């Protein structure tokens, strides 16, 4: 199984979400937040698709790649910066490097914040990503889903109902 940017992102956020997604229990199609993210992606930079290339390689899909400058542009709908976004973009750079493309960098863009962050990949990042891949494989190949965690982020997660519906009924 190819590890995708989504796997890296979910690994940073919640191992249970990672396991559910990797084991074909996908709830994103019912999420208003995912839909909102797609809208922002499609409308924030409407002319961008003409200028950049979409790239699919080893299970990753990069929507905006500037081939001339070897720059990945990753757009996030969030109103705050998150490590999960950073590691997802670093993973894209890592995969391109593994496939012989050198000198790649990235930019994380947050239209809601009107902010951009340049992203580079260090040798320490490469080691960390290699370790993450091993840990992700261990998690997703496990017989059972990891235990749910209680975080404020859970409420906005597309898997919220899947994880918490029983507890919601008990407390009401």
Where are these regions (language model features)?
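Metal-dependent nuclease catalytic cores that hydrolyze phosphodiester bonds in DNA/RNA
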Residues: 1-72, 76-83, 87, 168-172
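Cysteine-cluster motifs in flexible loop/terminal segments that predominantly coordinate metals
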Residues: 8, 14, 18, 144-172
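Short amphipathic alpha-helical patches
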Residues: 31-46, 116-120, 153-163
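Nucleic-acid nuclease catalytic cores
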Residues: 57, 66-142, 155, 161
